[in-house]
Amino acid sequence: MNIFDELKARGLVFQTTDEAALSKALTEDMVSYYVGYDPTADSLHLGNLVLILTMKRLQMAGHKPYALVGGATGLIGDPSFKDSERSLQTKDTVTKWSGKIRSQLERFLDFENGENKAEMTNNYNWFENLTFIDFLRDVGKHFTVNYMISKDSVKSRMESGISYTEFAYQIMQGYDFYELNQLHNVTLQLGGSDQWGNMTAGTELLRRKANKQGHVITIPLITDSTGKKFGKSEGNAIWLDADKTSPYEMYQFWLNVDDADAVKMLKIFTFLSLEEIAEIEEQFEAARHERLAQKVLAREVVSLVHGKEAYEQAVKTSEILFGGGDLRQLDAKSILTGLKAAPQHQIAPDEDLTLIELLISAGIAPSKRQAREDITNGAIYINGERVQELDYVLTDSDKIENRLTVIRRGKKKNFVLTY
């Protein structure tokens, strides 16, 4: 199976410009290809990861990746299928975010070895000294307004209004393809399915200005079985930066993937062979309650993004938090992350309350009678250890990093005391 057929088998091809010619090129030659990343945040996210891993698959197949940071286009903002104008970022912010993109991409792509080592460039390099007159004469003249407004990404904004700044974005992206072709013989662009209009502007400019054929592959929008955009948890993006989304949070995200989506996501987000995934699917379907596919997803993706050690720590954290282990083995940050949905109650560090008083004060028990019953019946745990002394008073050893104590009532009801 060649790389193009594998991408299709994994559900990673939505549209292409000339499938036969592209498949032939990917089979016979080393193809230089690129993906553009506009620095619109200080971290890439799970949606970007699909494209990053597709870049890696192509590099592993012998093709040469170029990561294009949109230092110029990031100052403008892509209007594609957005309801309103993007907020314009300052040049300093875009420059700072561009540097973070590079450091994240280095985790996945090989920038050091071989003829097909990855390279990174910034479109600010060619837009910085391009005058407005030159842009209109040398680039703008190759696009008709009719062509530009026919793009679905622009049509969706015609009624609500679109500025000339964002209207011209597709030409800027098209010019990126032209410049990369002239500088590095790049002939293929990868992008999300919402980028089709902008990407084909590049193949059009390449055809008109250089009489060359460029190729485009769009990746489908990754959705779950209900049709919702995949990659968010409770409405929040899953970031690749560990400070924005911890490895534990990412681990839990994958563990909670719906059964109907798990095998599909294994094909998209892991480097397990299709044969291995088929075997996992067979075992998974035979015993869905064991959630094998989700466990493999969590292992593969967290290890890929954050490393094996971070994955193992996430597993340990999960086992201790939900398996009844000693929470003092964990740091306060991991506990707060893992129990972020649990009620919190702040008390003074020097407040000497008995356990009964503490249960009532924190709202864990509604009355002294109930508190006594819970303690006597062994339903109260401090940092994972059962406490049955009615007059127990918290000690310094109960205060993890002098920041918190976790009280659990029964099997699942956790409460976090903070100091």
From Swiss-Prot:
Cellular localization per UniProt: Cytoplasm
GO cellular component labels: cytosol
Residue span(s) of domain S4 RNA-binding: 353-419
Short sequence motif named 'KMSKS' region, residue ranges: 229-233
Reactions catalysed, as given in the entry: tRNA(Tyr) + L-tyrosine + ATP = L-tyrosyl-tRNA(Tyr) + AMP + diphosphate + H(+)
Main location: cytoplasm
Highest taxon, organism lineage: Bacteria
Listed SUPFAM superfamilies: Alpha-L RNA-binding motif (SSF55174), Nucleotidylyl transferase (SSF52374)
GO molecular function: ATP binding; RNA binding; tyrosine-tRNA ligase activity
A Gene Ontology biological process term: tyrosyl-tRNA aminoacylation
Residues bound to ATP: 232
Sequence motif 'HIGH' region, location on chain: 39-48
Function text: Catalyzes the attachment of tyrosine to tRNA(Tyr) in a two-step reaction: tyrosine is first activated by ATP to form Tyr-AMP and then transferred to the acceptor end of tRNA(Tyr).
Family as reported in the entry's similarity comment: Belongs to the class-I aminoacyl-tRNA synthetase family. TyrS type 1 subfamily.
Positions annotated to bind L-tyrosine: 34, 169, 173
HAMAP family: Tyr_tRNA_synth_type1
Annotated keywords: Aminoacyl-tRNA synthetase, ATP-binding, Cytoplasm, Ligase, Nucleotide-binding, Protein biosynthesis, RNA-binding
Subunit structure: Homodimer.
Protein's recorded name: Tyrosine--tRNA ligase
EC number from the UniProt entry: 6.1.1.1
